[in-house]
Amino acid sequence: MTDPFTSDGAKMPPKPFTIEEGRRQVRSFVLRQGRFTPAQQRTFDALWPRFGLDYLGAPRDLAATFGRDAHKVLEIGFGNGAALRFAAQQDPSRDYIGIEVHAPGVGRLLNALEEDGSTHVRLYHHDAVEVLEHEIADGALDEVRIYFPDPWHKKRHNKRRLIQPAFAQLLVRKLREGGRLHAATDWADYAEQMWDVLDATPGLVNRAGPRGHVERPTWRPQTHFETRGQKLGHGVWDLLYDRDSGIGNRESQEQLPSASG
C-alpha cells in the first residue's frame, strides 16, 4: 500500500502554545502542521476514529479510552512514529499515547498502526502542554518519553526549547510516584540545559546521578540519523529520571525499580 504521507505539503504559519512561568510565558514547541493533500486527508479521516484522540479540554478516563487498566506511556513529539511503533510492538502489555503536531508524521504513524493491527496506541494531534494540563489527570502516567526535541540551536531561540522549568514541573505532576521520564538529545548544549532544569526539579531523581546519562535503553530504537551522526563523532545523551517524593539522594535512587523497560 502506498503511503500518502510522504510530503509535508504546503506549510501553515507557526502557532506557538505557551505555559506560564512566573511573569513570562514559555513556549512548549512551535506548531509545524503541514497541510494534507486530498489523498492524505482521506487516509487520515479513515484511520483517525480508530487511533485518534480529539482534544476536548477536559480530563480523560484513560482506562476507559483503552478498555483496560495498564501502564500508560506518553511520548511527546513522536515525529514519524518509529520509536512509538517499536515500543508498542515490543511491549503490548502497556498502553501508549503519542502527541505530535506535524500532520504528515501523524498520518504516517496512523498507517503503521493499521498495518500492525495495534489496539493499545492512541494519538493526539495537538499541543503537548494543553493535553497535559487539561486532559491528563495528575499521577495518571507511568512514563513520559521525549526523544530529540527541537534543539533551537541558535542562542536567541533557546527560550523556545521544550524542556523548561515550568514544563518539567508539569511532567512531575502527571507522573505517578515511581514513574519515569526518559529524554534524549544529540545536542550537547541541550543536554546541558536538560541537566540544569531536570536535575533541579523537585520530584525527579537522575538515574545516573547528577548531570549523568545512561546508554541507550533497549526500548528506544536507534535512528538512521543517529547512526550517521555517531559515525561522524556526534554524541547522543539519554537521560533517565525517576519520579519520587522529591528526596534526591542516592539511597532513594537505589531502592527504585530497575530501568529495564
Curated annotation (Swiss-Prot):
Disulfide bonds: none annotated. It catalyses: guanosine(46) in tRNA + S-adenosyl-L-methionine = N(7)-methylguanosine(46) in tRNA + S-adenosyl-L-homocysteine. The active site is at D150. GO terms for cellular component: tRNA methyltransferase complex. SUPFAM superfamilies: S-adenosyl-L-methionine-dependent methyltransferases. Substrate binds at K154, D186, T223, H224, F225, E226. Residues 156-161 are annotated as: Interaction with RNA. Keywords: Methyltransferase, S-adenosyl-L-methionine, Transferase, tRNA processing. Pfam families: Methyltransf_4 (PF02390). Its EC number is 2.1.1.33. S-adenosyl-L-methionine binds at E75, E100, D127, D150. PROSITE patterns: SAM_MT_TRMB. One of its GO terms (molecular function) is tRNA (guanine(46)-N7)-methyltransferase activity. Gene3D superfamilies: Vaccinia Virus protein VP39 (3.40.50.150). Pathway: tRNA modification; N(7)-methylguanine-tRNA biosynthesis. Belongs to the class I-like SAM-binding methyltransferase superfamily. TrmB family. PANTHER family: 3-DEOXY-D-MANNO-OCTULOSONIC-ACID TRANSFERASE/TRNA GUANINE-N 7 - -METHYLTRANSFERASE, PENTACOTRIPEPTIDE-REPEAT REGION OF PRORP DOMAIN-CONTAINING PROTEIN. Catalyzes the formation of N(7)-methylguanine at position 46 (m7G46) in tRNA. This is tRNA (guanine-N(7)-)-methyltransferase. It comes from Xanthomonas axonopodis pv. citri (strain 306). The lineage of its organism: Bacteria, Pseudomonadati, Pseudomonadota, Gammaproteobacteria, Lysobacterales.
